[in-house]
């Protein structure tokens, strides 16, 4: 039982590392900056990386290079 729990926790930690590494990619602004009045930043909030193979959630758009790349 402990082995399964440990594997589950390690997979969760690996997933969080991937997500945080993707958030830190390039010169992307912090999430709190996306909620401010700049319209271009607001549009970038609803996007997802294309390594999800287009399986974006909540109607997001897929961008090849983070949120700043051209929409796919």
Swiss-Prot record:
Keyword line: Disulfide bond, Ion channel impairing toxin, Nematocyst, Neurotoxin, Secreted, Signal, Toxin, Voltage-gated sodium channel impairing toxin
Gene Ontology cellular component terms for the protein in this record: extracellular region; nematocyst
SUPFAM superfamilies on file: Neurotoxin III (ATX III) (SSF57419)
Signal peptide (residue range): 1-21
Propeptide: 22-42
One example GO MF annotation: sodium channel inhibitor activity
Origin: domain of life: Eukaryota
InterPro entries: Neurotoxin_3_Anemonia, Neurotoxin_3_sf
Subcellular location: Secreted; Nematocyst
Disulfide bridge partners, by residue number: 47-62, 48-56, 50-67
Nuclease found in the keyword field: no
Membership in a protein family: Belongs to the sea anemone short toxin (type III) family.
Function text: Voltage-gated sodium channel (Nav) inhibitor. 1 uM completely inhibits insect voltage-gated sodium channel inactivation (DmNav1 from D.melanogaster).
Protein name, UniProt field: Delta-actitoxin-Avd2b 1
